[in-house]
Amino acid sequence: MTSPANRLQRRLGYQFNSSELMTLSLTHRSANGKHNERLEFLGDSILSFVIADDLYHRFPHVDEGDMSRMRATLVRGKTLAELGREFELGDYLLLGPGELKSGGFRRDSILADCVEAIIGAIYLDSDTEQVRKVILSWYQSRLETIQPGINQKDPKTRLQECLQGRRLALPAYTVTKVHGEAHNQEFTVQCEVTGLDKPVIGKGSSRRKAEQAAAELALKQLES
């Protein structure tokens, strides 16, 4: 019978030499004093470099602005959470009782952070070239389909440009609620937009993410 650890490693396309590193990468702050946040910090930087390097060589005639937007699309929390679900990481996360009860194994922010932590763990367990190969294998289809252009602009930028094009006032964002403990907060942001009857509400694990979520909803309403 295949063990859970082996199933996960097959999904990741990487066999760990250190089972302790793999376990640490899956351990949320709520579960243990020794958790994956340092690995997450490391993995975030490695991921950004690997994706930037690939885009630089993949698009030799694209300017810095478009490359930055493509990289942001590929390394954002939403994309990382999608990867986490593809790996079925929710089945392997080590969470405290509170996070388990609140469905933390489904939360985008926790899945995204875990993917970054796994990247950090693979780097420490192997080397730069090996972690590069793993990341590029995860991102192969996304890298083959991504293209420079307006679709890579974040929702706040697109909303601002949409309103400017219609000669309307810029949106106003207000934080209306912050819920949860310091390491696991949820922000609620209200976005007031000229042309919409009611403010739109966005939620996210940071103020910026909540604002982006609200802007995305506002765009959908303006375009409908």
From Swiss-Prot:
Summarize the subunit comment. Homodimer.
* Protein's recorded name: Ribonuclease 3
A Pfam match is: dsrm
Q: What does this protein do?
A: Digests double-stranded RNA. Involved in the processing of primary rRNA transcript to yield the immediate precursors to the large and small rRNAs (23S and 16S). Processes some mRNAs, and tRNAs when they are encoded in the rRNA operon. Processes pre-crRNA and tracrRNA of type II CRISPR loci if present in the organism.
One cellular-component annotation, GO: cytoplasm
Q: Which sites are catalytic? A: 44, 116
Catalytic activity line of the entry: Endonucleolytic cleavage to 5'-phosphomonoester
**Molecular function (Gene Ontology), one example:** metal ion binding
Q: Identify the SUPFAM superfamilies for this entry.
A: dsRNA-binding domain-like, RNase III domain-like
Q: Which cofactor does it need?
A: Mg(2+)
Report the EC code(s) recorded for this entry: 3.1.26.3
NCBIfam families (UniProt xref): RNaseIII (TIGR02191)
